[in-house]
Amino acid sequence: MLLAQTKTKQISTLINSIKIVLIGEFLKHRSFNGANKALPVLASSLFNAGFRQVLQLDLERPDLSIDDVLSDIRDADLIIFSGCLTTQWPEIDNHSSKIFAELQKYGRENVPILVGGYATKSVEDIARITPWITAYCDGEGEESIIEIAYAVARGTFYEEMPKLPGLCFINSEGKFHRTIATRVNNFDDIDQNFGLVHVPQVHDMDIFKASDGRQLKTAQLFTQRGCPWGCGFCNKSSESNNVIRLSEASFKRQLQQLKQRGYEAVYLDVDTFTVHDYAARREAEILHEEGFVWGSNTRIDKINYEQMRYLVEHNCVYMFFGVEHTLPEVSLANHKFNGSVASQIKQAFDYPAKIARVFQEMNQAGLPSSYFLILGLPKAKLNPNKTEIMGYEPTTFEDDIEAIRFGIEKCNPDFLNFNVLRFMPGSMAADTVGDCSYACVRPSGTKPITAGYFLPRAVNYYGYPQFQERGVYRLCESVSRYQPITTAVNPQRVYDTICYAMQLINHKIDAGGKATNLFIDRDLIALGLVTQDEQGKYAIAPIEDFANI
């Protein structure tokens, strides 16, 4: 008994003695606001396990710089870039190398530097040319980070690396050791906003305003994980399709904590809010009871008018729908639907009518709507009877503007936003080898897109095709500087597409219709490249003016 007590005390002392630094990278280009949830979630998980020296350094905070980070990591025992996106690799690469150099100055180069988040997908090519990053944490981190931290506290991290869940690295034999952390089946005890420093210009969402126009302090929460569908362009397409839910008790507790901190709005950052009808209604009721206005995401084919009315009655003021495209052949190429080929074909041809009906019902229900399209997708080639898929080809400009016209005229949305198809490692579109539906628009053809495509140093080292940076692509959501995108588009096509959408919006306003608002990169607005008048009508600068941004 005495031996066991002594061992427990020793472990407790070790846990309390180590310093863990969680780093959140800044996101250069954004159309939507939102917080890096990995920082508070992982910090909460570590706190619950007894770790008390955990720093959250979010580089999106205006009061933090990389110099502050370099100062804080000098006595750290574990450093983790948390919740990183693949698009952030240039920043991760730059900052991690500076951190390693700083540790070297103090003889502490053996301190593990880890990277977590979607940036770890297909990361072997970066790992092979980045010796200062110790390992990459693949999969959900709430439980695996505790095992990693325990190993660091015991002083056995390097010996235990092959056994630690989700840890990927180049081993002593020069092979890439690959593993993924198991799904977290219960996240009720985690405070998703633990120690979060609120950054209004990054976290508050302009879809949440008071009646007098005042911006509401916005929090993000997730109440479920997992998606039953496998849309190929989405990085959820290679994850588990089992949906895990947050308990009502935990949800209420966290909302009450947020209310005490002055929050008034909540964005539920989940894949399909209405995937389970009863759960969606209960969460709406709880949000209403706790005094929040809120919004979320769902699928066109997973909501009806009765649900919409119920959500609106319970303070829902925004629902995002990923329409992606209206052409049935595009839905088939993107694996939008589950089931047999015959079933998928039927669902694809029924989809446009569903889109129109749902948006009409949203307008009737008073639920603000968002119409989202992806440009440059592939489409299926069907046989004359439309019963078999014969192959795939790129969509055309005409295909895309037809989808826009359908959206503006048939759906009359409150918001309209675009994305150029980008290939994110971890999605079927990026990962699938061979002549898949995406090969006809993928810059690598039949080869997969890896994390290295997003890092200039890796692009140069491996000779990957280089994405040509074009300022006009910033008219679309989330297209950043180093990012492989569809070969189906070019700058003129993107510019012409956005111009066409603006013309339709302006024409609708002139005809007495409501304004549809585009989600536009704030930098473009600040530069005066895109303007909107008091009526909501748009004007855009000539394409040449986008060349140097």
Language-model-detected regions and their locations in the chain:
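Radical SAM enzyme core and accessory elements
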Residues: M1-I23, F47, F51-Q53, D68-L78, ...
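Acidic, low-complexity intrinsically disordered segments
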Residues: L2-Q254
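A general structural detector for well-ordered alpha-helical segments in enzyme core domains, enriched
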Residues: L42, V69, E91-E102, I129, ...
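A structural motif corresponding to the C-terminal end of an alpha-helix
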Residues: N48-R52, Y106-G107, R261, K354-S369, ...
